[in-house]
């Protein structure tokens, strides 16, 4: 009689599965973005929001404690149409409906974004996070005064594999979102007004895009990476608003340094209105230059700058008057926003970073900086200082029969 062959650890099925390798011979670790799955969750909504003479602060709201935040989607729908009276729509509409969009740590420290609505539009478009990032291509987009309709994201994740996604598993230490609706006036129209009692009403919805918490092992018993790649990496969008541009030579200091810069954008204005002369912006300057420490390393004509937007931002239809950028995230496919870590601009807190231009007229410039921090901090310190996310509190073991 033949002797029965014993079953080794390599052939023994994992508990709960038939003919599945055990955890002891599981092979390589499964990447986070394969073990986890993208999810969405309604975070909050406000109904019957009607602009008035005063700004309206909505929030702060705590994002639902769930997984790792990828982005925060903010959707504006007109539920009661308005009726304007000989009004001329403001050039930054409909994005200027938001006087401020702010994502923060539990203690109020800025995290991810803190800027005005139009600046957030620039961040979405020139930051190039979506496959087609030009917001005005949205299927429901409407910029009209009487029935605006659009959506805008607070970008958190840098690349679709989870890089930059922020842990948000604790309800007592959740990320917070605050929206400020602009008062009636220049944010909506440059002339005219709404008829009395005919101001539109909005519903504003917030959807959290996230990665779910992955199981410790997959169905084949392989170990799954439990957090996004390079956990602790975080990006920020910040704004230096209304910096004075004088007639003549300007050397304007960019104050947000100390991390790796992914995108720089500039919005030139004259008396609050985006404007450009025959050459560049409201100032009529012949070139835009960026000085990095002791050398000028980017010099561009206006046409070159505008053309780079068209070439690198997928399906962009038109450039915005007075808006210029310098991209440090061009990927191998020649598009902005792709993995291009080698092109991020490294800075120190002592780095001299300046915008140089010669102005024919005085005005202002809004400086938008998208920088990436790659230094993780102790999760216990997350609510005590300006952190970089990656919070992962102690939790029970994930239930999985193959563990």
Features from the language model and the residues they span:
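Short, low-complexity Pro/Thr/Gly
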Residues: 2-403
